C-alpha cells in the first residue's frame, strides 16, 4: 500500500489517496523496537487474525499479526529487516507465481535499501529505506549465540542473503 502510493505520487500527474482501515500510527509502542510485543493482538493496531488449525501442529492455530494502522503490518513488525529464505520465494515461483522467485525479487529488495553495510551483492547504499545493524551487543545475547554455535547451529552475520538458517543479530529499519 504505502510503497505503491509513494511510487505513484512521484509522478506529479497522479493524484493518490491512501486509505488504511486503522488510524494514524501514533500508538507509542509502534515506534519502540521492543514495543512490537505490545501491538500484537491489540485490536487498536492489529487485526488479531489466527491461522487455520493445522493437523501437523496438533490442530492448533497460531496468532497471525497483521497491522491495522497507517503503514499496515510494517508498523507492527518490531522494525525488523529480514527478507526470508530464498527457497521460499523459489517455491512460490515453482507453484506458478512467475516473477516471485528469489532471483526475481532480490533486485527490488536491494533497490529499496540504504544499508549501513554498504553496497554489495545483497545490499544497496542509496535506497529510500534506512537499514542498520544493532548498535549494542548484549552479553546475554552473545552467550546465546556462542552456545548455539557450540550445538552446531551456524552463526549468521547477515540474515538478508537468502540463507538465514542460524543464529545472530538481525538488522532494523
Protein language model regions, located:
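Conserved redox-cofactor binding core of oxidoreductases
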Residues: 93-173
